[in-house]
Amino acid sequence: MADPAIKLFGKTIPLPELGVVDSSSSYTGFLTETQIPVRLSDSCTGDDDDEEMGDSGLGREEGDDVGDGGGESETDKKEEKDSECQEESLRNESNDVTTTTSGITEKTETTKAAKTNEESGGTACSQEGKLKKPDKILPCPRCNSMETKFCYYNNYNVNQPRHFCKKCQRYWTAGGTMRNVPVGAGRRKNKSPASHYNRHVSITSAEAMQKVARTDLQHPNGANLLTFGSDSVLCESMASGLNLVEKSLLKTQTVLQEPNEGLKITVPLNQTNEEAGTVSPLPKVPCFPGPPPTWPYAWNGVSWTILPFYPPPAYWSCPGVSPGAWNSFTWMPQPNSPSGSNPNSPTLGKHSRDENAAEPGTAFDETESLGREKSKPERCLWVPKTLRIDDPEEAAKSSIWETLGIKKDENADTFGAFRSSTKEKSSLSEGRLPGRRPELQANPAALSRSANFHESS
């Protein structure tokens, strides 16, 4: 049976036989996996074996006279060396095991120490997190009031707890600075109730101060008609700056009556053509600076805006309006404001050019006489007139045409278009339109309506 060999990369590696166990190979080769490789001492190396083999060889070469006693002594020496080598290997293994066990124990001890340190730190943190509120109440450093409360501890420094003062509504930290910003300063001011309270208090105090110096026009019923407070200084300066002409006009023209009756001013119907032809400007609405006056009634009698309109006649079937209701509207005549040319006039802005205004060069008596002559309540009013078309002849004689700037023509018939005649009916039946007035020709809609009116009549 040939010796088993392994071929590796073209080389044959011979294997030793299983039955032969060499003492030198058992100690010089590698051990099993379970064993730890141990470096043998110099006495167990193969050099000694070579020397011994060399000695034995020399001994054999010298002669065969060596007896059995010499062979036995050599085997005893080998056994002693083998035993010594085994003892040294066992000692080395025990030393390695002790070193590994000591390293493992050291690691376990360090991990245990780290765990104990972490546990101690966690307990300390839990103790710090569960800090109790201070029992001692600290006074507020701003207002020295004891109405304070503890809020919480500072996140960065536990030695600086934060407190809150209920009186001055401010926070502060013990050992730190006081916050001058009140609570809720970042919010809108109209939401904070404190600001509302302060605003109401200021208004009431201002009204209380104004009630002392007030000149009111009292109504007989006890209600205030006009109120001039202490803040309306312009009214007093205006009253002092006006001339006596305006004062006399105010006395003669303004009459305060009960609100139920109103102010009734009768205008004569038989006005001359001169008076009817002059169109007076609208009276000005009085302007009082300062707070608006308080009116006890829903109607506004002083600042009545007079509209230049012509109300419809009674037979136009306006619901809820009687024929005499249009004439019952009342107006208060207003005095003409002073001219802007007067340097003493306190009013600002544009002014109307009135004839009654006093010029700087005229004397006071002349202006007063001129004011009495020229100031008539009929000229200062805009009275709506009703033009009735029941009688065309009377309507043609009315002065409203001159007011509107339409000249009368005695030969021409103004309302001839509204009269139906037999000639026009015959011309309409023939299909021809009769001659019309220029007023109707300028307005084709009125012309068509008049034609339809004539056809229907």
UniProtKB/Swiss-Prot annotation:
The keyword Zinc-finger applies. It comes from the Eukaryota. PROSITE patterns: ZF_DOF_1, ZF_DOF_2. Residues 74-94, 106-118 have a biased composition (Basic and acidic residues). GO terms for molecular function: DNA-binding transcription factor activity; transcription cis-regulatory region binding; zinc ion binding. Zn(2+) binds at residues 140, 143, 165, 168. Residues 337-346 have a biased composition (Low complexity). One of its GO terms (cellular component) is nucleus. Pfam families: Zn_ribbon_Dof. Disruption phenotype: Early flowering. The keyword Zinc applies. Interacts with ADO2 (via kelch repeats) and ADO3 (via kelch repeats). This is Cyclic dof factor 2. It comes from Arabidopsis thaliana (Mouse-ear cress). The gene is CDF2.
